[in-house]
């Protein structure tokens, strides 16, 4: 299990979890962890791509070293896999160590992929929608009264710019364009945080081929220089998040398990 962080000070704790630490961002790190700067890389895009600069590095530089018979998983320093739901306020570093997923259960062998429990858009209060996207909702008041209309596209428009998701989808290949468009229009939830655990190297290669080809095309629309605010600066990571949920649901047999939220900075600092 690769655990991605921005803080070199987290490496020791991540290793104690029996996870493989990955340090991204601009801080210097030592040789006892993975990064995204060596070999063929896109590390300069980390501000915009988030964890996908490591996925690219892994694909281009380390993939042959991965065991074909073992699960390949990814988590983050604030988000961890578990088989049980636990509220953030009930967690500590010690409890986290005893709760997170260390080994994939044998009964999961019939699946190709593990995804996080879905994020349901309509679980957010109406006032939050109004506060974030007043102009969007006023332009189409049905968003206030029709839960069905509050789909993935609506949520992306709200958080990352009106119609940006659809513009990006138009750049997809014919094998994904229509299916992904239907997914974001018809679904009111998605598997969040760009987290997954995959059992098949060949399946993961196919995913990497599709996602990076698409994100590279999206750069021609959105670029980098004019991306302002978190929602737009990280637009490539957010596009990937929605696509990941769609792609693995379309191409694999999957199961969903909880993701625990606990920022290890709370006790380790940075």
PLM feature segments, named:
Residues 1-270:
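ER/Golgi luminal nucleotide-sugar-dependent glycosyltransferases, focusing on the catalytic module
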């Amino acid at each position: 299990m690769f655990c991605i962080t921005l803080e070199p000070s987290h490496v020791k704790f991540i290793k104690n979890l029996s996870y493989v630490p990955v340090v991204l961002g601009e801080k210097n790190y030592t040789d006892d962890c993975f990064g995204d700067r060596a070999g063929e890389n896109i590390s300069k895009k980390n501000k915009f791509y988030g964890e996908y600069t490591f996925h690219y590095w892994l694909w281009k530089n380390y993939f042959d070293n991965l065991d074909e018979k073992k699960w390949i998983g990814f988590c983050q320093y604030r988000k961890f896999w578990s088989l049980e739901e636990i509220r953030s306020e009930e967690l500590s570093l010690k409890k986290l160590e005893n709760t997170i997923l260390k080994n994939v259960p044998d009964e999961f062998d019939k699946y190709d992929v593990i995804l996080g429990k879905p994020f349901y858009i309509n679980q957010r209060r109406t006032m939050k929608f109004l506060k974030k996207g007043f102009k969007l909702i006023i332009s189409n008041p049905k968003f206030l009264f029709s839960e069905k209309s509050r789909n993935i596209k609506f949520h992306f428009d709200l958080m990352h710019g009106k119609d940006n998701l659809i513009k990006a989808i138009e750049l997809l290949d014919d094998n994904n364009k229509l299916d992904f468009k239907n997914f974001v229009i018809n679904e009111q939830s998605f598997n969040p945080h760009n987290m997954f655990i995959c059992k098949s190297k060949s399946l993961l290669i196919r995913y990497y081929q599709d996602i990076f080809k698409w994100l590279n095309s999206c750069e021609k629309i959105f670029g980098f220089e004019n991306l302002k605010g978190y929602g737009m600066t990280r637009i490539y990571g957010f596009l990937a998040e929605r696509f990941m949920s769609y792609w693995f649901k379309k191409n694999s047999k999957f199961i969903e398990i909880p993701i625990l939220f606990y920022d290890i900075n709370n006790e380790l600092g940075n």
